[in-house]
Amino acid sequence: MLKTEHISFQYEDGKQALTDVSIDLEKGNIIGLIGANGSGKSTLFMQLLGINKPSDGTVYFEGKPLAYTKKALFALRKKVSIVFQDPDQQIFYSNVRDDVAFALRNLGVSESEVEARVTKVLDIVGAKDFQHKPVQYLSYGQKKRVAIAGALVLDTDWLLLDEPTAGLDPIGKKIMMEIIERLASQGKKILISSHDIDLIYEICDYVYMLKDGSVLTDGETSSVFLEKSNIELAGLVQPWLIKLHQQAGYPLFKKEADFFAHTGKVTN
């Protein structure tokens, strides 16, 4: 269990970044975190990783208040991993397999176990075809998959994804969505922070909407996005499938493929 209860956080310069924020990562398998720039999404990620300690309120990990000791934070970060928007921030080796294996080798895991776990996660993210390719020759999307593999290799339970589809072409975005859904089907809990509203609508089953460091609203994905007034108040826009439903009278579809199947058109 990973959640926050009424946490607030103020930076040293006096800026209030979070105010009375409560989120529960057990609310869904894939949870969306949305809000305009400066709404507190990145700061909240740092709270969930134990990098910053709240000024008020509590972060709960595995049913207990998080203790900010070296031992407690080590245990947290073995189970909660982040994948940054820019994969180059967390890829340090020129060889894909060595990069993914880095954390395990640093922990003294046996080489046979390292090889088995690296092979497993590279298969999960569809990176086996380029596992021996020098990192500098990988595409941006391939680097993102390597970064996810590096997070998964520790047998992470909770995965925090910062803008997972940013900078990807349509095929790359489709592959990333398939990876996220595959991970969720395997029992991983995923929190996605993104400005890609259509992605959040299609892939998430629960959403938290932030505004000025506070939770403006939360709930099942469709119910959150149907409330146009809240969307506008947060400085966001509705997903196109919601707009078609509310403005053109189409049935409410959760996925693009379902809409095109209904209209008799084919999409890739």
Swiss-Prot record:
Membrane recorded as keyword: yes
InterPro entries xref list: AAA+_ATPase, ABC_transporter-like_ATP-bd, ABC_transporter-like_CS, ABC_transpr_CbiO/EcfA_su, Co_trans_ATP-bd, ECF_ABC_transporter_ATP-bd, P-loop_NTPase
**Chief place of localization:** membrane
Binding residues annotated for ATP, in chain numbering: 35-42
Q: What class of enzyme is it?
A: translocase
For this protein, the record's SMART domains field holds:
AAA
Q: Where in the cell is it found?
A: Cell membrane
Q: Which GO terms describe its cellular component?
A: ATP-binding cassette (ABC) transporter complex
* An example Gene Ontology biological process: cobalt ion transport
* Keywords per UniProt: ATP-binding, Cell membrane, Membrane, Nucleotide-binding, Translocase, Transport
Name the source's superkingdom: Bacteria
Question: Which Pfam families does the record match to this protein?
Answer: ABC_tran
Signal peptide (UniProt feature, chain positions): none
Tell me where in this chain the ABC transporter domain is found.
2-237
- Lipid bilayer topology: Peripheral membrane protein
Q: What is its EC number?
A: 7.-.-.-
Q: According to its UniProt entry, what is the function of this protein?
A: Probably part of an ABC transporter complex. Responsible for energy coupling to the transport system.
Identify the PANTHER family for this entry. Answer: ENERGY-COUPLING FACTOR TRANSPORTER ATP-BINDING PROTEIN ECFA1, HEAVY METAL TRANSPORTER
User: Per the similarity annotation, which family is this?
Assistant: Belongs to the ABC transporter superfamily.
NCBIfam families assigned: cbiO
In Swiss-Prot or TrEMBL terms, this protein is called Putative ABC transporter ATP-binding protein lmo1207
Lineage at the top is: Bacteria, Bacillati, Bacillota, Bacilli, Bacillales
